[in-house]
A protein has these predicted regions:
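Short, surface-exposed recognition loops and adjoining beta-strand edges that mediate ligand/DNA contacts
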Residues: 348-366, 485-500, 666, 699-711
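Extended amphipathic alpha-helical segments enriched in small hydrophobics
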Residues: 461, 465-482, 524, 629-645
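Catalytic cores of secreted or luminal carbohydrate-active enzymes
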Residues: 86-110, 675-718, 722
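Well-ordered alpha-helical segments within folded domains of soluble proteins
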Residues: 371-381, 441-452, 518-528, 583-592, ...
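Acidic/histidine-rich catalytic neighborhood
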Residues: 474-533
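C-terminal catalytic domain of Rieske-type non-heme iron oxygenases
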Residues: 353, 357, 493, 501, ...
């Protein structure tokens, strides 16, 4: 159905958040669809500022030891002062724009019958319009198999002229070389700000210089062609096909990309020397994309809104929430973004996926790993795309090496550590500024939740043995050292913060506590998963026993006077009661330490915490809350949050606390744009339809009343079991399971055990 798989607009984009994204994990493009002068904003996943360097602050170990002693003594303000004055490091590096492909056409911008679209079923963007007798058509896509962005320009009933040129905000030169338009440049050596200022610098010292890059364009046409540094000029054409590719000199996080970089010009020239057949390139692209995208299909109904432009549908949704297919469209768009921004061999998806137009993007468009990067990958496994997870796993593997030195020199501890920001150079130290965001050594523990889940969904024991468990154990070793006894004999992780949130201490804000609920939840889940992995692999029993002993003595969850789950060590007054982070609820989601059935008292405390926090928030915060309410088995409240996420947002402003929604191109609005909210919504839909924990698969655990009739095909459950479901009148009518082994199915409070033999088992109710 086109109303759930097709974005279309009746005018060109005027701002970036109206443009349509394409990507192949490495190359990204944003298509405006302009008539007289088209712009395709370009990105390459490896193009960042900076170079490898040691960011460990001298004297930080002594500072940490002082801060820990002060926190345990209840001197929290003094502990925070030490952390901020003597422990913090420098800022992460920034993800950069590659440049713009500019297409300048003959004629004016007068047009009729204009349509700009993105087909989620094929991952192809299109533009079409009339100019007098001429019918102008464009197709654009980013091919993963051929590693190019392909642009097809067609004119019916006439001919056209076009000039293709390249622009760039970085230091660069453009020239004609080997029959191609070639742009080569250099990235800044440093982005040393907090992400809100336009400060980037170029060094002349080779060991400090930034990476090099090349972007090249090839043109095939039936018209006349002339190439110079100004561009590729084509006249008298009916068909033009452009193939664009790019490479950087990035050669791994440990190597200097200027002095020890990999080739970047030669691979581009070699790649474009191929005689491409456009239809073959297009067919290979569609087949490659559909191999991932077509694994899942959701149908919750349609109201025949496909004749209304997508932007108008989004605006109308505020008053008319009967456009039920808009939910499915956002679900499908999120899966499209995941495939387009993360592929085997690419870098992981950043705060903005792989799409960034700004020289100094918000928050550096980095990996913010106190929820945002993790949220990017929440829907990947339940939507049966484990391949898309690989870049994240590889980054965590890198961090497990890079963070060893940080753990040893900053904390005096074994294992490895990282904090709340990471970049392509695998920075693991805390950034500068305030402890409220910068002091958070918990990202490895959260990442280990992801890498163990990858095993649970795929059941790949070789992966668990060789990749996941060694990283998990190394992370657990750090937290074993981090734990210390409190005054009551409980093991706590001191000092600690709750990401980006403060409490009131003696009339002013304070972030540092003796420990926090999120910190303890992450450690508890990691230890439990390490014990599970040890049992599965039949090894490391001695270490598992150490973890079991520590779990017995760890500080438990606690409930406050308002019936809420406590966030900090003591019951504190929140500085910002409606704060965007709900970090104390980590045990509810993404972990399963708290469940509606297994720990009802704690689940009620989570519900009360959500009521106190309120429903509104930034875009990604709304996405997280969809997942929370689904875990609490309240599908109607989850859908209420989904409705809020579908609020239309204009392309201006920044808001740290509330006002999240969706831009016209369906990008999530923090605001500004952050892609995590898109992925949080997809994950929330999966949670409403399927939940898996303790060896059981829960079918339709939080189905909203509004989604009374529907079906879903291809969701992946833990145990590597594919699940199809059909429901009517809010009741499950049929389900199919494909996989091996026992499947413990729970529906309507009843558990049924099925034994699967690799085929498909179908059950009618």
């Amino acid at each position: 159905m086109k109303d759930s798989s097709f974005l279309w607009y009746d005018k060109p984009a005027s701002v970036w958040t109206q443009a349509l994204p394409i990507g192949n994990g490495t190359l990204g493009g944003m298509i405006y669809g302009k008539v007289e002068e088209e712009t395709v904003s370009l990105n390459h996943d490896e193009l960042w500022t900076g170079h490898p360097k040691n960011t460990i602050r001298p004297g930080s170990l002594e500072a940490f030891q002082k801060a820990r002693a002060l926190a345990l003594d209840g001197k929290l303000r003094e502990s925070q002062d030490i952390i901020e004055s003597d422990f913090m490091s420098t800022w992460s590096q920034a993800y950069l724009p590659l440049g713009d492909l500019v297409l300048t056409f003959d004629g004016s911008d007068r047009k009729s019958d204009y349509i700009r679209s993105l087909d989620l079923d094929t991952a192809i963007a299109s533009v079409s319009y009339r100019q007098g007798k001429r019918i102008m058509r464009r197709e654009l896509f980013a091919s993963h198999p051929d590693k190019v962005i392909a642009v097809r320009l067609i004119c019916e009933n006439g001919k056209f002229d076009v000039t293709a040129s390249l622009k760039c905000q970085l230091h660069h030169k453009v020239k004609s070389q080997s029959g191609l338009l070639v742009m080569s440049g250099e990235a800044p050596s440093e982005h040393n700000t907090n992400g809100q200022s336009d400060k980037q610098s170029y060094s002349k010292v080779d060991s400090e210089r930034g990476m090099l890059f090349t972007c090249a364009v090839k043109a095939d046409t039936d018209g006349k062609k002339h190439i110079s540094g100004k561009g590729i000029e084509i006249t008298g054409a009916t068909v033009v096909t452009l193939y664009l590719t790019a490479e950087t000199s990035f050669n791994g996080w440990q190597n200097n990309a200027f002095t020890n970089g990999k080739p970047h010009l030669e691979p581009c020239i070699e790649r474009l020397s191929k005689n491409f057949d456009y239809e073959a390139v297009k067919s290979a692209h569609i087949a490659d994309y559909r191999a991932l995208y077509s694994r899942v299909e959701l149908d919750i109904g349609s109201n025949g809104k496909d004749n209304i432009p997508t932007g108008k549908r989004l605006r109308n949704f505020k008053k008319d929430k009967n456009d039920i297919a808009l939910y499915t469209l956002l679900f499908n768009f999120g899966r499209y973004l995941a495939i387009s921004s993360s592929r085997p061999g690419s870098q992981p998806s950043t705060l903005q996926g792989i799409w960034n137009e700004k020289f100094c993007p918000p928050w550096h468009s980095n990996y913010t790993v106190n929820i945002n990067t993790e949220m990017n990958y929440w829907p990947v496994l339940p939507c049966d795309m484990p391949e898309v997870n690989e870049p994240l796993i590889e980054m965590v593997r890198d961090l497990s090496v890079a963070g060893e030195r940080t753990a040893k020199e900053m904390y005096g501890m074994h294992g490895f550590v990282a904090h709340h920001n990471v970049d392509i150079w695998r920075m693991t130290t805390p950034v500068g500024g305030c402890a409220v965001w910068a002091f958070w050594p918990m990202s490895p523990g959260w990442f280990c939740e992801h890498i163990f889940a990858h095993y649970e969904y795929t059941m790949d024991e070789k992966y668990l043995r060789e990749t996941a468990y060694p990283i998990m154990k190394k992370s657990a070793e750090f937290y074993c050292d981090y734990l210390v006894e409190d005054k009551d004999g409980y093991l706590i992780a001191a000092p600690s913060t709750s990401p980006e949130n403060n409490f009131v201490l003696n009339g002013s804000n304070c972030a540092v506590s003796q420990t926090t609920t999120m910190t303890m939840s992450i450690i508890r889940e990691l230890f439990e998963n390490c014990i599970k992995a040890s049992d599965i692999l039949g090894e490391d029993k001695e270490f598992a026993e150490i973890l079991k002993d520590k779990l017995k003595n760890m500080l438990p969850f606690r409930i406050g006077k308002r019936g809420q789950l406590l966030e900090w060590y003591n019951e504190e007054k929140e500085s910002e009661i409606h704060h965007r982070h709900c970090s104390m609820l980590y045990g509810l989601h993404p972990a399963h330490l708290i469940t509606a059935d297994g720990t009802p008292e704690l689940a009620d405390a989570c519900r009360r915490s959500l009521e106190i926090r309120g429903d509104d928030g930034t875009g990604w915060s709304l996405g997280w809350k969809i997942n929370f309410w689904a875990r609490l088995r309240d599908g109607n409240h989850a859908l209420k949050l989904f409705d809020q996420q579908l609020r239309f947002k204009a392309s201006t402003g920044m808001n740290y606390s509330h006002g999240g929604g969706t831009y016209e191109n369906l990008f999530d609005a923090h605001p500004p744009f952050q892609i995590d909210g898109n992925f949080g919504a997809v994950s929330g839909v999966c949670e409403m339809l399927l939940d898996c924990f303790d060896g059981k698969i829960y079918l339709l655990p939080a189905l909203p009343d509004k989604w009374s009739d529907g079906s879903v095909r291809g969701l992946l459950a833990k145990g590597n079991i594919k699940v199809d479901m059909t429901w009517s009148g809010g009741k499950l009518t049929l389900y199919s399971l494909t996989g091996n082994g026992e499947a413990h199915i729970v529906y309507g409070g009843k558990e049924t055990v099925h034994r699967l033999d690799g085929g498909t088992l179908t059950v009618e109710l």
